[in-house]
């Protein structure tokens, strides 16, 4: 069964593809469709943005689409960067710049608790949607560690593993990550939803 992921982010594509392929899905993404329109993320929550992306792409393609909106919420920054995680340091969406700004804003801060949040929305061309949310609690480190992952992964420490998300192997990350948790919630409902 084909499923299109509504993202141009190669890191998200790789992570979601690794989780969806074993479920029997043939995964494509907006990277395979360079002419597909970009959705303006005007929502104020991860769920709203995921639904905007999924419903617009499903209507455009006439096919079921899975959209992810995810980000980092840092307690000492009142939940920022939140839905602006990708654009925290500016519209160019640079992981390095975002991480540098986060470290700058947390300079001298002892409360470094944070969470990754992922909202996944599966939409049909009819507009019917199924939305789930996954979170993982952690802390922000003082310097980037690890080569795997993307975004804030090199700074986000997973307490139970004493590693940053960027130090985790793909299989480890799939078990504990916010995206993995959301996908497991979706997994129980995805086949009936797609067939219904």
UniProtKB/Swiss-Prot annotation:
Enzyme Commission no: 3.6.1.66
NCBIfam families: PRK14822.1, RdgB/HAM1 family non-canonical purine NTP pyrophosphatase
Reaction catalyzed: XTP + H2O = XMP + diphosphate + H(+); dITP + H2O = dIMP + diphosphate + H(+); ITP + H2O = IMP + diphosphate + H(+)
Keyword flag Transmembrane: no
Function: Pyrophosphatase that catalyzes the hydrolysis of nucleoside triphosphates to their monophosphate derivatives, with a high preference for the non-canonical purine nucleotides XTP (xanthosine triphosphate), dITP (deoxyinosine triphosphate) and ITP. Seems to function as a house-cleaning enzyme that removes non-canonical purine nucleotides from the nucleotide pool, thus preventing their incorporation into DNA/RNA and avoiding chromosomal lesions.
GO cellular component, one term: cytosol
Recorded family membership: Belongs to the HAM1 NTPase family.
Pfam families hit by this protein: Ham1p_like
UniProt-annotated binding residues for Mg(2+): 40, 69
Cofactor(s), by name: Mg(2+)
Protein name as catalogued: dITP/XTP pyrophosphatase
Top-level lineage group: Bacteria
CDD domains registered for this protein in UniProt: HAM1 (cd00515)
Cofactor note: Binds 1 Mg(2+) ion per subunit.
Subunit architecture: Homodimer.
A Gene Ontology molecular function term of the record: XTP diphosphatase activity
InterPro entries listed in its UniProt record: dITP/XTP_pyrophosphatase, ITPase-like_fam, RdgB/HAM1
Swiss-Prot/TrEMBL keywords: Hydrolase, Magnesium, Metal-binding, Nucleotide metabolism, Nucleotide-binding
Catalytic residues in the record: 69
GO BP annotations, alphabetical order: nucleotide metabolic process; purine nucleoside triphosphate catabolic process
